[in-house]
């Protein structure tokens, strides 16, 4: 039967086609003959198994495999012949029970019209890692490994304070009885800023009453937006003890030589990797936002958007599960809340693909390899991780998609109207 294409929506198509029976049978016979030449079945010599036995043993499975292969091949050929550009995978159903006529339903890429990226405005941020940044990172590492000793003087920023508190908000006392025990490192923001400031200078056994006004969005509902008197009693004050940056300390971070210069070089490499990721991420986000603004009027394939929304919901459910909370309380239609964000993701993804296709941008294999090495370098066994990615098609597909998107984003940035902005390392990674 001839291929029949129907429009069943602005972006949805239905394609009716058939797999030639003689071609199917020819491929099945050829595959069964290949199996017969190598089959080892009890009671028969190798290569001498009767065709009827081979058919009984393998016929059904081989026919299904060959039909699936021919289905895809025939559909791909029809799609190419009619210059169709699919947005997502096609759903294939039998057109008649048990026959060889099929119906493929799919969505197509919308028409974006002219894509002129030269009208976009891009801020190209640049930054570099300095010795000061390395010094700061070493101090952060020392803080991570710090120990505590009881302080003989009042609390300062960076000190650990163990305390008991109770609060009075009008006629309401929290807790209703007794006190709440807790601790905070002054300056860390674990407790509300006004409380932490009120603890500075206090020593073990000191008590104080702090007048605090909590913001409207404060996490404790009974205190949100209220002026509260917080009663505090200091139980203990501890000061930090930082480790010396010596050979033992350096080796504990995987620097086998234990030398300071090697340690600093390792830190520089890590910071530069972090910086590059931050700059690329910011550029991707900025260009993505501009593409969304410029092409928000273009209708997106609804099934593709819904699929993306469900994927976003699935990720959130997994995060909820990993945090120990119960994900079953999420309603079945919760994906609807992700539809707007999903539509934007689909829009940017399709535009990236469209720009790559129109301008014949090709995936850079060297860049893929560099990205793999970059990913692997963050693990204890980088070579093992590198090979794991290389041998896993799904992992490789994810890396290749990431690299291709970065190539397109850079291609756009090179042709857009640019403004240069020089930032410090800290400014770059915090934006």
Swiss-Prot record:
Domain PPIase FKBP-type: from-to ranges: 158-243
Gene Ontology cellular component annotations, sorted alphabetically: cytoplasm
Alphabetical keyword list: Cell cycle, Cell division, Chaperone, Cytoplasm, Isomerase, Rotamase
GO BP terms: 'de novo' cotranslational protein folding; cell division; chaperone-mediated protein folding; protein transport; protein unfolding
Enzyme class: isomerase
Keyword field contains Cell division: yes
Gene: tig
Family annotation (SUPFAM superfamilies): FKBP-like (SSF54534), Triger factor/SurA peptide-binding domain-like (SSF109998), Trigger factor ribosome-binding domain (SSF102735)
One Pfam family from the record: Trigger_N
E.C. numbers: 5.2.1.8
Catalytic activity: [protein]-peptidylproline (omega=180) = [protein]-peptidylproline (omega=0)
Top-rank lineage group of the source organism: Bacteria
Role of this protein: Involved in protein export. Acts as a chaperone by maintaining the newly synthesized protein in an open conformation. Functions as a peptidyl-prolyl cis-trans isomerase.
GO MF annotation list: peptidyl-prolyl cis-trans isomerase activity; protein folding chaperone; ribosome binding
Similarity comment: family membership: Belongs to the FKBP-type PPIase family. Tig subfamily.
Protein name as catalogued: Trigger factor
Entry text on domains: Consists of 3 domains; the N-terminus binds the ribosome, the middle domain has PPIase activity, while the C-terminus has intrinsic chaperone activity on its own.
């Amino acid at each position: 039967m001839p291929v029949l294409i129907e429009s069943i929506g602005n972006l949805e198509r239905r394609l009716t086609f058939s797999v030639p029976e003689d071609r199917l049978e020819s491929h099945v016979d050829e595959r069964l003959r290949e199996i017969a030449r190598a089959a080892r079945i009890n009671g028969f010599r190798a290569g001498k198994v009767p065709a009827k036995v081979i058919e009984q043993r393998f016929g059904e499975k081989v026919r299904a495999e060959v039909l699936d292969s021919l289905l895809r091949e025939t559909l791909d050929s029809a799609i190419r012949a009619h210059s169709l550009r699919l947005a997502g995978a096609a759903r294939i159903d039998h057109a008649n029970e048990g026959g060889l006529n099929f119906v493929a339903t799919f969505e197509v890429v919308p028409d974006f019209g002219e894509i002129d990226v030269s009208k976009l405005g891009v801020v190209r941020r640049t930054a570099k890692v300095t010795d000061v940044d390395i010094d700061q990172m070493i101090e952060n590492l020392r803080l991570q490994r710090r120990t505590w000793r009881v302080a003989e003087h009042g609390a300062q920023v960076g000190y650990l304070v163990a305390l008991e508190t109770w609060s009075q908000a009008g006629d309401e006392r929290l807790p209703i009885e007794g006190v709440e025990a807790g601790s905070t490192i002054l300056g860390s923001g674990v407790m509300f800023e006004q409380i932490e400031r009120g603890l500075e200078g206090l020593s073990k056994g000191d008590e104080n009453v702090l007048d605090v006004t909590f913001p409207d969005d404060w996490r404790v509902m009974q205190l949100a937006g209220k002026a509260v008197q917080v009663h505090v009693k200091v139980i203990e004050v501890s000061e930090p003890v930082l480790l010396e940056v010596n050979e033992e300390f350096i080796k504990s971070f995987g620097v086998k030589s234990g030398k300071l210069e090697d340690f600093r070089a390792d830190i520089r490499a890590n910071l530069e990797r972090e910086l590059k990721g931050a700059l690329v991420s910011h550029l991707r986000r900025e260009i993505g936002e501009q593409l969304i603004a410029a092409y928000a009027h273009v209708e997106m394939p609804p099934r593709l958007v819904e699929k993306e929304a469900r994927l976003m919901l699935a990720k959130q459910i997994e995060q909820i599960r990993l945090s120990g909370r119960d994900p079953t309380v999420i309603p079945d239609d919760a994906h609807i809340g992700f539809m707007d964000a999903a539509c934007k993701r689909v829009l940017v993804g399709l535009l990236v693909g469209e720009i790559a296709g129109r301008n014949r941008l090709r995936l850079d294999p060297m860049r893929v390899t560099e990205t793999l090495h970059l990913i692997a370098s963050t693990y204890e066994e980088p070579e093992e991780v590198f090979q794991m990615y290389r041998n896993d098609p799904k992992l490789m597909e994810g890396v290749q998609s990431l690299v291709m998107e970065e190539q397109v984003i850079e291609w756009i940035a090179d042709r857009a109207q640019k403004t240069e902005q020089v930032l410090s390392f800290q400014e770059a990674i915090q934006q």
